[in-house]
A protein has these predicted regions:
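Membrane-helix interfacial anchor on the cytosolic side
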Residues: 439-455
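C-terminal amphipathic helix plus adjacent low-complexity
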Residues: 344-424, 433-440
Length: 455
């Protein structure tokens, strides 16, 4: 069987798929993995044929910061989807026609994979390394007000971008056709149903395979003291003041501290390092977590999953809305506590609380047990094989809007933007914005009435 996989250039989205690649290859399948040069080494080490997407268009090279915006900044995401899809169109469509893959597997943020699969009518599997997302789970996941406002103000530009996709033969009715998976899309989610918010609202097309972790290469020895691990991940980790506060908080603590500060942090600039603390630009996180008793984390999905797999309770310090959602879930299930402030006193108090809370440790262990009960790479590979054996199926895209519907949407969106801006103003300006918003809202309904009359 031939499999084409697509991913964004992010370690947190790539790493969970590598075990699946190895499992598929062990079953005699061939995998072509479309990603970015920064991921070449680990993808080729897993045994896949690596195809560099950034070779097709120099403008496609994504920074780590841009990768982190995918899926969070909806306006940016839509523009990127169109740009990447059009850049890949000729070459990748030709590749797919030549390779004739039995199935396409696309990261949930590599939306172009789904568009290509639909265009060529090839069976498709969504690979979801974050929580699965639907209307119900979206209600409990935080969103950025600024991102939503940016999306609303960019709707006109977004719709023009989608027209470019339609001209190339991509069936796209609205941006929601790209950004949302439906209940009929075969999907692999790299967590357990127990950890997934609103898990009961997802259909049987969703396989919760659990985290797929690599073996620990070089195990660390257990210390006679509690081990505390501190890391803010691989993307947004340049926070020297936070690291200095951790050093101040724990310099005389009766514990072994291991702190990973990222490649871009100058360790010498952090000041004197106490004897009980080890500071490195990068560590073998799996090896450290395997012997840790507490983890101070930014709450990236992979980091949290790895910690819970080993039953390590968490001190939660989320930096983005997505990480806030993961932190909220950990807190709701009783496996971690929020860091109240990033001051030395608060950090020390939070770590002491986590180290001394048997209930947190028990909840973390329970979630780790739920991960181990999942099918892992074998379950993910089974889903991919099963999808490849079925005819391609895609839900019909939402119909393209009529001119009247477009006018209604534009006027209604403008009204909503004015009302949102009014929330941050006062006095006469606020009253004017509210009046204008109400008038435009009425105008939107008039367009709706007139459009219905024409149908």
């Amino acid at each position: 069987m031939k499999i084409a996989m697509f991913c964004i250039p992010a370690h947190g989205h790539t790493n969970p798929t590598l075990g699946v690649v190895r499992e598929l290859i062990s079953r005699g399948h061939e995998v072509w993995y479309y990603s970015y040069e920064m991921m070449r080494g680990k993808i080729e080490a897993a045994g896949a044929h690596f195809v560099p997407c950034d070779a097709y268009d120099p403008q496609m090279r994504l920074s780590a910061e841009d990768s982190a915006r995918i899926g969070k900044d909806l306006a940016f995401s839509t523009e990127l989807i169109v740009r990447v899809t059009l850049a890949l169109d000729d070459a990748v469509i030709a590749d797919m026609q030549r390779l004739a893959p039995d199935v396409i597997v696309g990261d949930s943020m590599a939306f172009w994979a789904k568009l290509i699969a639909r265009k060529l009518n090839i069976p498709f599997v969504s690979s979801t390394t974050t929580f699965a997302f639907n209307k119900e789970s979206s209600k409990v996941m935080p969103s950025s007000r600024g991102s939503m406002l940016s999306f609303l103000t960019s709707l006109r530009k977004i719709n023009k971008s989608l027209d470019l996709l339609r001209e190339k033969g991509y069936q796209v009715g609205s941006v929601l056709d790209i950004l949302q998976n439906d209940q009929e899309t075969d999907t692999v989610v790299y967590t357990s149903r127990e950890f997934q918010p609103c898990a009961e609202t997802f259909s049987d097309h969703y396989t919760f395979a659990g985290p797929i972790l690599r073996p620990v290469d070089t195990p660390l020895e257990k210390s006679g003291l509690p081990t505390v691990y501190i890391s803010l991940g691989t993307v947004d980790n340049r926070h020297p003041d936070f690291y200095r506060n951790c050093l101040a908080a724990l310099r005389d603590a009766p514990c072994r501290v291991i702190m990973s500060v990222g490649e871009g942090t100058d360790i010498a600039a952090l000041g004197e390092i106490p004897g009980n603390i080890t500071v490195q630009n990068r560590v073998d996180q799996m090896a450290v977590l395997a012997v840790s008793d507490a983890f101070v984390t930014h709450c990236g999905m992979n980091s949290v999953s790895e910690a819970l797999y080993f039953g390590v309770p968490l001190l939660l310090f989320p930096l983005t809305p997505e990480e806030q959602g993961v932190a909220n879930r950990v807190s709701a299930l009783g496996a971690g506590l929020f860091l109240k402030e990033d001051t030395p006193d608060s950090i020390r108090a939070g770590i002491d609380a986590v180290l001394n809370a048997d209930n947190l440790r028990a909840s973390a262990k329970s979630l780790g047990d739920s991960f181990r009960r999942c099918g892992g790479a074998k379950a993910a590979a089974d889903k991919i094989e099963n999808t490849a054996g079925k005819p391609a199926h895609f839900s019909q895209p939402q119909p393209i809007m009529t001119p009247g519907q477009k006018a209604q949407a534009l006027v209604g969106t403008t009204a909503l933007i004015l009302l949102l801006i009014a929330l941050f103003t006062h006095g006469t300006v606020r009253r004017i914005l509210l009046i204008l918003g109400a008038i435009l809202g009425l105008g939107s309904n008039i367009f709706r009435f007139l459009d219905k009359g024409k149908q």
